[in-house]
């Protein structure tokens, strides 16, 4: 446990950021899975779900949750399946 005041604050800030990042990553994964399932089942709303997945991947990449190349790769593979 840190003794210095600034180190204590950093621990608190990091914990908050960790929670927020985990939730954002989970939401991103959920939208991507929904899009993949829609493409696999050839659902009517697959285009909307693909757009949502692309948006969430781009947002995660811009926030630094995932690398931009990883986002591009996932988007490319999703588009290829569709």
UniProtKB/Swiss-Prot annotation:
NCBIfam families listed in its UniProt record: S20 (TIGR00029)
SUPFAM superfamilies: Ribosomal protein S20
Protein name in the entry: Small ribosomal subunit protein bS20
Disulfide linkage: none
Gene Ontology process terms (BP): translation
Organism encoding this protein: Lysinibacillus sphaericus (strain C3-41)
Keywords per UniProt: Ribonucleoprotein, Ribosomal protein, RNA-binding, rRNA-binding
GO cellular component, one term: small ribosomal subunit
């Amino acid at each position: 446990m840190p003794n210095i005041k600034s180190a204590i604050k950093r621990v608190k800030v990091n914990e908050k950021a960790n929670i927020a990042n985990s939730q954002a990553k989970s939401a991103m994964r959920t939208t991507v899975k929904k899009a993949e399932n829609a493409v696999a089942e050839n659902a009517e709303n697959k285009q909307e779900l693909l757009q949502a997945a692309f948006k969430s991947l781009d947002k995660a990449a811009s926030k630094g949750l995932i690398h931009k190349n990883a986002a591009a790769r996932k988007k490319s593979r999703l588009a290829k399946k569709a």
